[in-house]
UniProtKB/Swiss-Prot annotation:
It comes from Thermosipho melanesiensis (strain DSM 12029 / CIP 104789 / BI429). Coiled coil: none annotated. PANTHER family: S-ADENOSYLMETHIONINE DECARBOXYLASE PROENZYME. Is synthesized initially as an inactive proenzyme. Formation of the active enzyme involves a self-maturation process in which the active site pyruvoyl group is generated from an internal serine residue via an autocatalytic post-translational modification. Two non-identical subunits are generated from the proenzyme in this reaction, and the pyruvate is formed at the N-terminus of the alpha chain, which is derived from the carboxyl end of the proenzyme. It catalyses: S-adenosyl-L-methionine + H(+) = S-adenosyl 3-(methylsulfanyl)propylamine + CO2. Belongs to the prokaryotic AdoMetDC family. Type 1 subfamily. GO terms for cellular component: cytosol. The lineage of its organism: Bacteria, Thermotogati, Thermotogota, Thermotogae, Thermotogales. Pathway: Amine and polyamine biosynthesis; S-adenosylmethioninamine biosynthesis; S-adenosylmethioninamine from S-adenosyl-L-methionine: step 1/1. NCBIfam families: SAM_DCase_Bsu. One of its GO terms (biological process) is spermidine biosynthetic process. This is S-adenosylmethionine decarboxylase proenzyme. It holds the Pfam family AdoMet_dc. The record marks 62-63 as: Cleavage (non-hydrolytic).
Length: 130
């Protein structure tokens, strides 16, 4: 089924706690994850909370990647939303699983903007005239 985008919602468990609490490492990893997908990076913003935890977003031309960490639990919540046929969010997922040293994951993929539900013909390209 064709769609405008794919949204991967990932729960990373039993991660490296030091990495999860390092804002520089998380930002670098999220940017690298974006590049792994083949996306074009637009901007990013990351914040370290006190006493611990990091939240951040990488905005890409094709949508966004976000992360929220709870180092005290070894847990990270990650959203990987990409649009178009030229990027693969699963590459970002695999990269982050390795970098965060996650021992266990729960992940679902949700198709966003399904062609049949919007009324777009299956053979239409992603980019059309407005």
């Amino acid at each position: 089924m064709k769609s405008l985008g794919r949204h991967i919602i990932a729960e990373f468990y039993d991660c490296n706690k030091e990495i999860l609490d390092n804002v520089e490492a998380i930002e670098k990893s999220m940017k690298e994850a974006a590049y792994e997908t083949g996306a074009t990076l637009v901007n990013s913003s990351f914040h370290r909370f006190l006493p611990y935890g990091v939240s951040g977003v990488v905005v890409i031309s094709e949508s966004h990647l976000t992360i929220h960490t709870w180092p005290e639990y070894g847990y990270a919540a990650v959203d990987l939303f990409t649009c178009g046929d030229d990027v693969d969010p699963w590459k970002a997922f695999s990269y982050l699983k390795k970098i965060l040293k996650s021992q266990r994951v729960h992940v679902v993929e949700h198709l966003r903007g399904k062609y049949d539900e919007i009324g777009i013909p299956e053979n239409s390209p992603h980019k059309m005239e407005v």
